[in-house]
Amino acid sequence: MFSIYNIMQYILLLTFVATVLSQSNLRGNSDLSAVVGDQVFEWKEFSNFQERFSKKYSSLEEMEERFSVFRENFRAIRQHNNDLSQNFTMGINQFTDLTPAEFKATYVSGLKAAPLQASGCKSFSSGASSAPETVDWRLHNAVTPVKDQGQCGSCWTFSASGAMEGAWSISKGSLVSLSEQELVDCAGLKYGSMGCNGGQMDGAFKYAIDNGMCTETAYPYTSGVTKTAGTCHSCSAVDHFSSCSDVKANDQLSLKAAVAQQPVSIAISADTKYFQSYSSGVLTSSSCYTSLDHGVLTVGYGSENGQKYWLVKNSWGTSWGDQGYVKIARSDSTNDPGICGIAMQPSFPSV
């Protein structure tokens, strides 16, 4: 039997096709068939999208609005992927029914633009002359599975926890998933944090230096659903950190040297349609800007088809990007913010 939701979908499809036919000035049956075929194909993709990501809309009007947004994004994805000069592909993901403004407000507004003042982190710089050609910390049990921040501006906590997880694993030989919720709830204004309204990775490191960090199991993440911070409560810290370091700004050789030692927190610009729909390949200069708005984790670097890249772990789940990861173009510049601003604010903790 059809559900009410199935009937809504069917009504909207019929309405949509009828509108196309009534407004069409096409001169032949072949042209008409092509247009209707494209519209039906887009609707099928939208239906598959709803099923894949468990999307439910409250009314026919909302479904129509979301289909319109999906269709615009889907057309942009197809147009991009048909351009053989591009170094990366785009694809349908959980954000394809969101406008750029909606995407920005919910998923790329969790990083404070200015660095935390007087964070207490040391300075780090190096020529990276002895760094290996490729690094992937996932292969050395220093990276936990991709997580999902949900509808909370807590990217900074996932970036910071990932860097701390890596540092602890490399130092102690044990990979432990740490609590982002502890940082959301407990690292307040003293550490430059406003919970789901943003924060800085350096502030998270300073909190961990002062208090230690609890495990994900002991203090599980809930703000992705509640969309707000909870009440800070005590837990038994299992990982402790002694200091943090800020990598020399705009110096990709120093960043390379740091990543050769351990995963490194970075801030990037993610407020573009390219990042919203990124699927695979290497993001390049035309793809994003340098207005920092999102915290992520660099877990390695390498090259692909002659293009150097940084390997970056995101916090939007495995449905986004390349199983939750993105490759961002890399260079050997020592005076350049890098693609998406990747070299502007790198930092890492020490055990």
Regions found by a protein language model. Name each.
Residues 1-11:
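Positively charged n-region of N-terminal signal peptides that target proteins for export
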Residues 9-351:
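Catalytic-core signature of thiol
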